Amino acid sequence: GGPGSGKSYVAQELFGIPKKVNVSVSGLKSVNSDTEFEFLLKKFGFETFGTGRLDIDQWPDEVFDAIAGGDEDSEQMTVRKKAKLMTKDRKERYMEGRLGMIIDGTGHDYAKLSKEKKQLEALGYDCSMIFVNTSLKVALQRNSERARRLPKDILMKSWKDVQSNMGKFQGLFGSKFVVVDNSKFLKPEDAQKKFGMITRKYISKFVKTPVKNHIGKKWIKHNLLLRGKK
């Protein structure tokens, strides 16, 4: 989903991820570079004094580019790049152990996500996508209310890119593609009811279903034999 869609909130509700913890009740590991990024920004003193907010939308363009710009492939070592590299390292360690993961990202880059899906499937993973959808109006409102606000133009471009990719994602994931509408501001009890239904219908079924990927099946069988189990 796009920025301001409430992806992390929905992930917490659907998968049962306690706050300040990156593991779900079913053992899935949460992977989100924003966690490392916000940690580093606060560590290096980029909070707006006395507010606890990270008002990066108010930074001059050159400051934003020098600190929050770039990704793991960019030449300049920005705080964002360092966060991406930290997240990449953690994710690769999860992949080495074939641990289940919840990869929390925007999905604005279809080619990158499609490549990542192929890499995971080549290791034996079964993949599913939950697309968290919101209107642009709601995304802008949520962005203005959160501690780390994105510049409006960046949010709008990312939101539009994600929306244009929705049909492609549906084709890529097929029956393993689920859309969650998170446009409404729900009361806690209503949110629990809504997300509880989605969890029971889709999430629990996916998590509890044995691995179908033939590469994954072989990996599991091989490792059970190494441990002396049949």
Outline where the language-model segments fall:
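Glycine-rich phosphate-binding loop of ATP-dependent small-molecule kinases
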Residues: 1-230
